[in-house]
């Protein structure tokens, strides 16, 4: 990250002209691909732990994978659908989020106190500053919209990663799902996914923006117009992303556990309420928190990586566009 980028950040104004949709899509795609490829083993382990009706332990599951003939390949099994889902899902999410936040940023009510959220405060970001309710709402809507579009890829990914079906290829997984369950099978677990993703994404954006503001205030006690250093900006975004993900993940993990069971065994579990009832009857309440440690680890790291990369790319682009606009004045 360049020092120029960090020191120009307070002067960059986020407008509908500079925040081009195509670049938000590209930045989201890049950040999503980076996090999904690096953290695929954690995602695979989470699926394996959650698929068990006896709530399998992490270490025995990992030991089984490592003892296979091709442990490295096994750990990254399902990387392609995961990268497609996370990469394009992130691209759609960040694009939709920006499209929602830009017009809301023009409203004094939704930015809070006549736009004071944007004035006289130190910032590690060039993104719009909104009220808590606006952050909660835009995060939830953007995530559910992106999740619906990417749902077929998500279902195929979960089935392919699981050893419950032992599919030999992604194409074979998709073909079998459509053949046995119809096209609606590609959307198995969407209700649980939406119930998990809407509050998760809303809470995440809310916590993330609050933590960034709080950490920026702790980091610098100088004048209000003092810009953040380059390392401070990236570290604040990374730490805020990780902490926000941990908090939101813990609150919404039961929905993730239910979603996994519905996607793996829709015939048995049927719907959300039936799945919750059966899981508690057969495995106890702890089954609703299966894979929590793995999910927190993966979500904290993936969210921190994705948002830090995304914020840096957007910040650099905003500055470049501002410089070009200034040069033509």
From Swiss-Prot:
Solcar repeats: 19-103, 130-214, 232-316
Protein name per Swiss-Prot or TrEMBL: Mitochondrial glycine transporter
Source organism: Aspergillus terreus (strain NIH 2624 / FGSC A1156)
Main location: mitochondrion
Gene3D superfamilies: Mitochondrial carrier domain
Family: Belongs to the mitochondrial carrier (TC 2.A.29) family. SLC25A38 subfamily.
Superkingdom of origin organism: Eukaryota
The protein's role, per its UniProt record: Mitochondrial glycine transporter that imports glycine into the mitochondrial matrix. Plays an important role in providing glycine for the first enzymatic step in heme biosynthesis, the condensation of glycine with succinyl-CoA to produce 5-aminolevulinate (ALA) in the mitochondrial matrix.
One matching Pfam family: Mito_carr
GO CC term (a single one): mitochondrial inner membrane
Organism placement in taxonomy: Eukaryota, Fungi, Dikarya, Ascomycota, Pezizomycotina
Keywords linked to the UniProt accession: Membrane, Mitochondrion, Mitochondrion inner membrane, Repeat, Transmembrane, Transmembrane helix, Transport
Chemical reaction(s) catalysed: glycine(in) = glycine(out)
Biological processes, Gene Ontology terms: glycine import into mitochondrion; heme biosynthetic process
Membrane-spanning segments: 25-50, 78-104, 136-161, 189-212, 236-262, 291-309
